[in-house]
């Protein structure tokens, strides 16, 4: 665990960045950047010991920020729901600007996504797998561009960088598995790709906090590019069936080629550079449900 460092966390109100910032704030000076349009977000950061900074990574000038951060975890993102040019500018160009501005840091983590990969069928995706354009095309190609920009900046200026390709996170803060739980509780269908089983490697909050911090510690030049996921593989079909057993609801699956293709990452390299995850998926899903729905008695 890092101690006595000055750390910048962007996108700090998000489900991934907030738990990491909260953990680091116990022994470090943590600055949390986000738009902070809701006063409740600022209060939540202050309660966690995080220094809140209202900042829009897509519009504000990074020159206004301090340049003496020792570590950076860059999770701010434009999801690409609107103009594709804006997504490209925010995710790629502004990330490069921030990386250069924080070039004195001993470790910089750029949050990419496993959705940069083209679907390869029912086999795990290694970091060398080719890119593709899944359903969220704007987001995916902007992240591919961002990886290229950040890699160039890091190599050019000898900045230690880790690019993590986030695959499937979940926990008390939420995540896609939590979204699927809500569909189950509402007795609504869960859309899945026909190429079943839909395999994933979900990573629980405790583990992604630990591996997120580890990613900052191992940052290097040339940059490390690594899948960021759980050590265990489980299909959506199996984990939804397990959640159904816990809450007493049968999942309804709707198979359609219009659904997201499965994202099944190869975690061999992750185990080498970041380590293995510790929370088994069954324990993690039970803990997620208990945290998000304490009113439901679990069987």
What are these model-predicted stretches?
Residues 2, 7-26:
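N-terminal Rossmann NAD(P)H-binding glycine-rich loop of SDR-like oxidoreductase domains
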Residues 39, 50-90:
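NAD(P)H-binding glycine-rich loop region in Rossmannoid oxidoreductase-like domains
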Residues 96-138:
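Conserved Rossmann-fold NAD(P)-dependent oxidoreductase catalytic core, especially the SDR/UDP-sugar
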Residues 134-162:
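Active-site Tyr-X1-5-Lys
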Residues 151-200, 205-207, 243:
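NAD(P)-dependent short-chain dehydrogenase/reductase
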Residues 169-171, 192-199, 224-234, 256-260, ...:
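Glycine-rich Rossmann NAD(P)(H)-binding loop
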Residues 188, 211-214, 218-258, 266-267:
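Mid/C-terminal beta-alpha module of Rossmann-like enzyme folds, strongest
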Residues 205, 235-241, 255-287, 295-299:
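Conserved C-terminal active-site "lid" loop/helix of NAD(P)H-dependent oxidoreductases
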């Amino acid at each position: 665990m890092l101690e006595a460092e000055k750390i910048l966390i962007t996108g700090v109100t998000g489900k991934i960045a907030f738990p990491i910032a909260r953990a680091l704030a116990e022994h470090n000076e943590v600055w949390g950047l986000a738009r902070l349009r809701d006063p409740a977000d600022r209060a939540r950061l202050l309660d966690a010991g995080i220094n809140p900074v209202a900042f829009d990574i897509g519009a504000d000038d990074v020159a206004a920020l301090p340049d003496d951060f020792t570590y950076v975890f860059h999770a701010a993102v434009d999801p690409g729901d609107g103009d594709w040019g804006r997504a490209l500018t925010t995710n790629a160009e502004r990330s490069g600007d921030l990386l250069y501005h924080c070039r004195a840091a001993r470790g910089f983590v750029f949050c990419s996504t496993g959705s940069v990969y083209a679907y390869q069928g029912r086999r795990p995706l290694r970091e060398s797998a080719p890119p593709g354009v899944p359903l969220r095309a704007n987001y995916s190609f902007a992240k591919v561009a961002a990886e290229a920009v950040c890699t160039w900046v890091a190599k050019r200026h000898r900045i230690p960088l880790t690019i993590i390709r986030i695959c499937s996170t979940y926990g008390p803060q939420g995540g896609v598995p939590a979204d699927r739980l809500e569909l189950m509780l509402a007795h609504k269908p869960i859309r899945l790709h026909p190429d079943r089983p839909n395999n994933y490697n979900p990573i629980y909050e405790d583990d992604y906090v630990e591996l997120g911090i580890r990613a900052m510690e191992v940052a290097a030049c040339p940059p490390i590019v690594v899948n960021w996921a759980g050590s265990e593989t489980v299909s959506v079909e199996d984990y939804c069936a397990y959640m159904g057993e816990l809450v007493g609801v049968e999942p309804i699956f709707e198979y359609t080629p219009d659904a997201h293709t499965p994202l099944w990452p190869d975690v061999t390299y992750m185990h080498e550079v970041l380590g293995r995850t510790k929370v088994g998926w069954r324990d993690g899903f039970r803990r997620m449900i208990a945290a998000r729905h304490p009113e439901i008695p679990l069987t």
